[in-house]
UniProtKB/Swiss-Prot annotation:
Enzyme class label: lyase
Organism from which the protein derives: Mycobacterium ulcerans (strain Agy99)
InterPro entries reported in the protein's UniProt record: Asp_de-COase-like_dom_sf, Asp_decarbox
Similarity remark: Belongs to the PanD family.
Protein name: Aspartate 1-decarboxylase
Cofactor(s) the protein needs: pyruvate
Cofactor binding, note field: Binds 1 pyruvoyl group covalently per subunit.
Pathway listed: Cofactor biosynthesis; (R)-pantothenate biosynthesis; beta-alanine from L-aspartate: step 1/1
Amino acid sequence: MLRTMLKSKIHRATVTQADLHYVGSVTIDADLMDAADLLEGEQVTIVDIDNGARLVTYAITGERGSGVIGINGAAAHLVHPGDLVILIAYGTMQDAEARAYQPRIVFVDADNKQIDVGHDPAFVPAFDIPGAEELLNPRIGAR
């Protein structure tokens, strides 16, 4: 049996730009793509924390170190700059692999800089990690 499992998640990133007239996709900082084990063209689900919108698109690599999370194409009608989003990728795997697989969960600060990487989708980093308090409200002191 094949199972579809959580493969990667970038948790509570801030949308930095939206371009309605781009052909589609989500632009993600190359550092975050690497941390989350996302490939150019990989399918991702975007969950907008602010308005509840959910959509499926594909990832394109943004400038390394820029913190860019750019919503492109028609999705820009649903997700806007400043919105908090969760970016999720799923993988299909055999049952045995699924039972042992550990997803990549990337936590970011208000500037979309990585502050932690883990494997437990229910875990929130300890507050002794610089920037972790922003996971509860990443807009603190950011805008």
